[in-house]
Amino acid sequence: MAAVSETVLVSAPQDHDAQAASDPQATAADSPLEDFRVRCTLKRAVMEVMEMCGRFVQELGAVLPEDVRELALRDAQWTFESAVQENVSFNGQAWEEAKEHGLMDSDIKVLEDEFDELIVDVATKRRQYPRRILESVIKTLKAQHASLKQYHPVVHPLDLKCDPDPASRVEDLKCRGEAIAKEMSEAMKALPVLIEQGEGFSQVLKMRPVIQLQRINQEVFSSLYRKADFKPDTCVTHVETTPAETGARKASNIVLKRKKAPDCAQRKRYPLRLQRINLDM
């Protein structure tokens, strides 16, 4: 009886342990699975941490042999990044589902504050900068005027070299001076003649035209005023001539004058020219 009772006492705790072990499984089946991943808010910050840790992974390759270093580093880097991506969540989302540029409310608030400050700064500069620009422009113009007043053109001095033999130059100057003096004396001698010629020319210009010159002018330009109905027979006059029977006479300067014809309008328009008859024939 005692042995039986002992087995019961020993077995009883075993049944209790088995029941206690089966209870967590039942509760786990009844409740949803717990998320053991690290909760993060910004994917960008996690990527920066991964990049920083990747440098340490690259430094570990210094102790590896060269033939397997590149492959081992690539495998270690891929394993590290895969492990981080699988064990990180962003607001309950996996690595692939989360956005890289996710912003929190605090970040948005900070950005809004910075944007407001920029707006205020720009508005202030719009009021102040035109005045400052105008002042700087005025100062610049004044400085330019002052610099222009101080500007003086540079004059380079000429090097005057003395002729080692000035006698030849002096002789040349003497010859030229004599030639110029001779020309001036000749000009002064010819000056009275030129003055006399000029006075005569001025007297000729002041003279009035003679009647004979007027008649010549009329004869020259008479063809411009000649009419078609003009009959020259009406104005022709007889001229005295010597008869043919007369013998040879001595040369004389006697000029036979024409008889004056009665005045007519045609004679006034077209006067006859005076003709001289040579009697030395």
From Swiss-Prot:
The keyword Coiled coil does not apply. Residues 19-30 have a biased composition (Low complexity). This is Kinetochore-associated protein NSL1 homolog. It is found in: Nucleus; Chromosome, Centromere, Kinetochore. Component of the MIS12 complex composed of MIS12, DSN1, NSL1/DC8 and PMF1. Interacts with KNL1. GO terms for biological process: attachment of spindle microtubules to kinetochore; cell division; mitotic sister chromatid segregation. It comes from Mus musculus. Part of the MIS12 complex which is required for normal chromosome alignment and segregation and kinetochore formation during mitosis. Pfam families: Mis14. InterPro entries: Mis14/Nsl1 (IPR013950). Residues 11-30 are annotated as: Disordered. GO terms for cellular component: kinetochore; MIS12/MIND type complex; nucleus; spindle pole. It comes from the Eukaryota. Keywords: Cell cycle, Cell division, Centromere, Chromosome, Chromosome partition, Kinetochore, Mitosis, Nucleus.
